[in-house]
Amino acid sequence: MTDTLDTTAPSVTYADGQGSSDVTVAVIGAGGKMGQRVSNNLAKSSYTTLYSEASPAGVELIESLGRSVTPTDEAVAAADVVILAVPDVVLGTVSEQVVPAMKSGAVILTLDPAAAYAGLLADRDDIHYAVAHPCHPSVFLERTTKEEWADTFGGVAAPQEV
């Protein structure tokens, strides 16, 4: 996995009506608890968003919101950013299916830092990996000291809003 900043990765802005329609985001697990939260925020942005869901109940929910469901393989192949909003226990398996189908230079974002830390994600040198959990916004806040930057798992050094 790469851990350096690559300025060629798609630019990402806040989901407050901003964003670029040139950036396509795929939400895998869009009908689940976390997928709904992520999808609802992306729906407020200008990003092209593709919603993928395996469960019939999740598909029904997505469609009830007026959103179309895209098959996972199609969503992943088209996406600049792939968000894995799936249960932690299947994250490794889903990443093994998704990562090989991603575009070179795309970003994969998981909502579980433990899976990445444990090396459970499929590895590919030509994509970028990121982790951000909606309940742990400290990774998005300004950090100034070396200790704050090193504290990405919710310890005491990083600023906390939760």
Question: Which sequence ranges carry the predicted segments?
Answer:
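Conserved glycine-rich cofactor-binding loop
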Residues: 31
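A short, basic/flexible loop-to-alpha-helix module at the beginning of a structural domain
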Residues: 2-21
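N-terminal Rossmann-fold NAD(P) dinucleotide-binding loop
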Residues: 35-36
